[in-house]
Amino acid sequence: MNSISITPGSSLKGELVVPGDKSISHRSIMLGAIANGVTTVRGFLRGEDNMATMAAFRAMGVRIDDDGHLLSIHGRGLHGLEEPGDVLDCGNSGTSMRLLTGLLAGQNFFSVLSGDQYLRKRPMKRVVEPLSRMGARILGRAGGNLAPLAISGGTLNAIGYESPVSSAQIKSAIMLAGLYADGDTSVREPSLSRDHSERMFALFGASLETFHNGVTVKGGIELHAQEIHVPGDISSAAFFIVAALITPDSELLIRNVGVNPTRTGIIDVLRSMGGSIELVDEREVSAEPVADILVRSSRLKGVRIEGQTVPRAIDEFPAICVAAACAEGTTSIRDARELRVKETDRISAMAVNLRTLGVTVDECDEGMDITGVERLGGGVAESFGDHRIAMSLSVAGLVSADAVRVNDIDCVSTSFPNFFSLLERFRTGAP
């Protein structure tokens, strides 16, 4: 299926469960593989990105059993990985490539990381540079900025690193390398990015300390296997949250969603726009906050989004842009230049597509201004191979005057394989 046409449907009512959190699923494989013992994972996201991570560790000698419900990772210990006999293919996954670069920097073997045509265009110098400071030997195209990356691992030195951007991928790559460094490795960010790595490192028994916008990891500490329960991904829930808000007479309950405070910027933004969003039955599972999310259709208004809210909602901006297009007034997004180096340039991609649907969008280097319309128009939208762009534009089709055809939608399997079947179920009002 390479394109889909979405037409307006009925109100969205009922309950649903979204796939497991992609970030937590990646990290459960990585830490489980280098821990001692067998780590079990329930709720693992079997999207293409996470399967790329799984394949990489299998290629390094890690036994991973998967019965479709429970994942069992037979850890090899901190120094038990084997040299892969071929290039490790990360597919479209920037998380796989950047975090693996950090982990592989500390291994006593040679490895090569590559990916698809989109991933090979994404900047890698942001992790290569600090890892090189630690003593890693990493070569790549464009002076180490573009994959494929060739990594000759070995002994690493601890560093203190001031990251120029708030990025969980940069932070996590350095933290993973820090497990193999001699001494204490620290990373500080301009503002705190998602902290799944810090939580999971602590759960597995790593020695770490957190401080204001930063973390310190002690090298040489062995990890121990855990039982992991992965909650639903709030980035996937975001599409249905926005869909319920903008579709009249809707009420959706999304069960078992991770509501880590470093990830709930989407909820804060949509509430500030007037959205009715309630967290129900808040609890903690595997060191992560979890809740059910109750959403009711709401009249939205434009707001300004900037500062520390941005990294807490960085992956949800395509969905936020659709909400802004349906809101009264203008929504201004600033401090969001990171969106330009995601799977695609998400600022440009959303601007182009929203204009196609009749929305006025003014683009700037670090963000955009979106002036909402009473009703979106129809048209042909392009995903640019970006799963979040494809899903956001499909949500727009729920409330458009005419059909929205979204091209190049196979990318959705990266993070939400059953997205379109769920969307169709609610769009048609099927039970």
From Swiss-Prot:
Main localization (coarse): cytoplasm
Subcellular localization: Cytoplasm
SUPFAM superfamilies noted in UniProt: EPT/RTPC-like (SSF55205)
Cited InterPro entries: Enolpyruvate_Tfrase_dom, Enolpyruvate_Tfrase_sf, EPSP_synthase, EPSP_synthase_CS, RNA3'P_cycl/enolpyr_Trfase_a/b
Pfam family, one: EPSP_synthase
EC number, as in UniProt: 2.5.1.19
Keyword Transport applies: no
GO biological process: amino acid biosynthetic process; aromatic amino acid family biosynthetic process; chorismate biosynthetic process
This protein's pathway: Metabolic intermediate biosynthesis; chorismate biosynthesis; chorismate from D-erythrose 4-phosphate and phosphoenolpyruvate: step 6/7
Catalytic activity: 3-phosphoshikimate + phosphoenolpyruvate = 5-O-(1-carboxyvinyl)-3-phosphoshikimate + phosphate
Binding site for 3-phosphoshikimate: 22-23, 27, 167, 169, 315, 342
Binding site for phosphoenolpyruvate: 22, 94, 122, 169, 346, 388
GO molecular function, one term: 3-phosphoshikimate 1-carboxyvinyltransferase activity
Keyword entries, A-Z: Amino-acid biosynthesis, Aromatic amino acid biosynthesis, Cytoplasm, Transferase
One of the record's GO cellular component terms: cytoplasm
Annotated catalytic residues: 315
Quaternary structure note: Monomer.
Function according to Swiss-Prot or TrEMBL: Catalyzes the transfer of the enolpyruvyl moiety of phosphoenolpyruvate (PEP) to the 5-hydroxyl of shikimate-3-phosphate (S3P) to produce enolpyruvyl shikimate-3-phosphate and inorganic phosphate.
The family this protein is said to belong to: Belongs to the EPSP synthase family.
Protein name: 3-phosphoshikimate 1-carboxyvinyltransferase
